[in-house]
Amino acid sequence: MNTLTAPLPMATDALSQFGHDAWWVIGLKAVLILVVLLLLTLFNIWFERRVVGRMQHRPGPNVNGPFGLLQSLADALKLIFKEGIIPKAADKAVYLIAPVIAVIPSFITFSVIPFGPEVTIPFTDTRTPLQLTDMPVAVLFVMAIASIGIYGIVLGGWSSGSTYSLLGGLRSSAQMISYEVAMGLALVAVFLYAGSMSTSEIVAAQDNLWYGLILVPSFVIYLIAMVGETNRAPFDLPEAEGELVGGFHTEYSSMTFALFFLAEYINMATVSAVATTLFLGGWHAPFWLDHAWAGANEGYWPLLWFLGKVLFFVFIFIWLRGTLPRLRYDQFMAFGWKRLIPVALVWIVAVATIRSISLDGGVDRRYLLIGIGALAVVFLVLFFIGGAAEEQPTTVPEAAPAGGYPVPPMPAGGPVRGAAVPLTFDRSSPIASSMPQPSAATRSAGEEI
């Protein structure tokens, strides 16, 4: 039977595993998540600098520790002990609390991310899932908490007392609102196939087939939207150095700057973990390895598969930063509203139709192929032909010279802006008589030219 039309196994009742842990087990898992995120952030910073260094034919950090692994830790210690400078025009209370607002939601989102199946805690007989908690609307919880972090960026830009910071904060808010819509629409197809919004149930539903293989448009839309959500290159417009110096953290230094930096890299890990959970089977081993090795999804091995998939998405972030130039702000916003969102809406309708027909008894493959072909044509029209109707930028004509001198701004009632100004004028006027007259040699030279 066709993969797209075959009834997929619905998610199991994985929520029954939660709500039974002892208090010390919950505390232990919370501390471990915090430690893993901090270590993963230090590793990702080192990994990015090494990969970008190789792309630019240089070694990258290679002095502190083996392979330079301790360079990120050294940089963190340096920022901790640096002096914190608060601008005179800043709102001190909001200025200091903004980085905290930005970083806390990035930690909270990992509370519903499944790192692995149920395991036995070493040196005890207690069994617990490698996930802090879960809920029936866990994915919506992740998106809601992640959107709170934008308040820290906007408040940080506003409270700094700098125009550059304020513009960076406003850009970031507009960017996140625009691409969060596309991201949410990309996830609707996953909900339709899994029959649940619980992260653990979505992972369980991908036991035999990953959604990234059958929901390719949703996967691609999510990949683009997650780069825009995290303000990473080529969508790092809120902190464009050539336009806004440093964007919303221009006036930040020391530990407050480190918190913004930490929030950015943890958000990278968050969207990568969500992509792993919803599209690449979560902690499940690659399907070819699962068939060859029966114990691939047992014990603590799933934690390794999960982290490997997360690092794969982190590498995509780094690769995009090292290869693509930054987009213009108008191009970026138009791409989100005029391309991603319409395509996501069309794809949701197609997925809902295919899913409904498949659950009612299947559909002939020929009709399915015809429908997919028509859908592909719509995608092509939206992506390529739609750009021709965009408004062309207008150019302002240069001011025409008069008698060798620039034309000053015309008073009210003068020619309309852009209208041609005659090159000759009445030299007997009072204005012309007060102007210096060119010599005979200058006039003859001008005539020869």
Curated annotation (Swiss-Prot):
It is a multi-pass membrane protein. The chain crosses the membrane at residues 23-43, 93-113, 137-157, 176-196, 209-229, 258-280, 300-320, 332-352, 368-388. GO terms for biological process: aerobic respiration. One of its GO terms (molecular function) is NADH dehydrogenase activity. It comes from the Bacteria. It is an enzyme of class 7 (translocase). It catalyses: a quinone + NADH + 5 H(+)(in) = a quinol + NAD(+) + 4 H(+)(out). PROSITE patterns: COMPLEX1_ND1_1 (PS00667), COMPLEX1_ND1_2 (PS00668). NDH-1 shuttles electrons from NADH, via FMN and iron-sulfur (Fe-S) centers, to quinones in the respiratory chain. The immediate electron acceptor for the enzyme in this species is believed to be ubiquinone. Couples the redox reaction to proton translocation (for every two electrons transferred, four hydrogen ions are translocated across the cytoplasmic membrane), and thus conserves the redox energy in a proton gradient. This subunit may bind ubiquinone. Belongs to the complex I subunit 1 family. This is NADH-quinone oxidoreductase subunit H. It comes from Nocardioides sp. (strain ATCC BAA-499 / JS614). The gene is nuoH.
